[in-house]
Regions:
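Active-site "cap" helix and flanking loop/linker of ATP-utilizing ligase/carboxylase catalytic domains
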Residues: 1, 6-8, 17-65
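Peripheral (often C-terminal) accessory segments that flank ATP-dependent C-N-forming ligase machineries
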Residues: 41-103
Length: 103
C-alpha cells in the first residue's frame, strides 16, 4: 500500500499493489534491508527483517527522456545513487530510473 501524508498531516492512499513499489526503492540505500529482500522473504515464508532507517533520504523518479542527461553524467556525489532501469525504449511518461540522495 502506498500512502502519502500532506503538510496538514492528512493521509492519502495512492495505490494498493501486491508487489514492491517505486516509492520504496529508497530502502536500497537508506535502510538496513531493502523492500526487495523483505518481499522475497515474505514470498518464501521467511521471517521479515525489521526495517531500521539508516539515513533520511529523498528519491526522484526519472521519467522519459530525463534519463538521457543522467546517463551522460560522469559524477555523482558520494550520497547520490543513480539507478538506470536499462529499458530498451524511452517513452514519454515511462519511469526509466531514479536517483536516491541520502540526507
Amino acid at each position: 500500500v502506498e500512502f502519502f501524508i500532506d503538510r496538514n498531516d492528512n493521509l492519502y492512499v495512492n495505490e494498493i499493489a501486491p508487489r514492491v513499489h517505486n516509492s520504496g526503492h529508497l530502502t536500497i540505500n537508506a535502510f538496513n534491508v531493502s523492500q526487495f529482500e523483505n518481499h522475497i522473504r515474505a514470498v518464501c515464508a521467511l521471517d521479515q527483517i525489521p526495517l531500521k532507517k539508516l539515513s533520511n533520504a529523498k528519491m526522484i523518479n526519472l521519467i522519459g527522456d530525463q534519463i538521457s542527461f543522467y546517463r551522460k553524467s560522469p559524477k555523482f556525489k558520494d550520497n547520490e545513487f543513480f539507478f538506470d532501469y536499462l529499458k530498451k525504449e524511452v517513452k514519454e511518461k515511462r519511469k526509466m530510473g531514479h536517483i536516491t540522495t541520502l540526507l
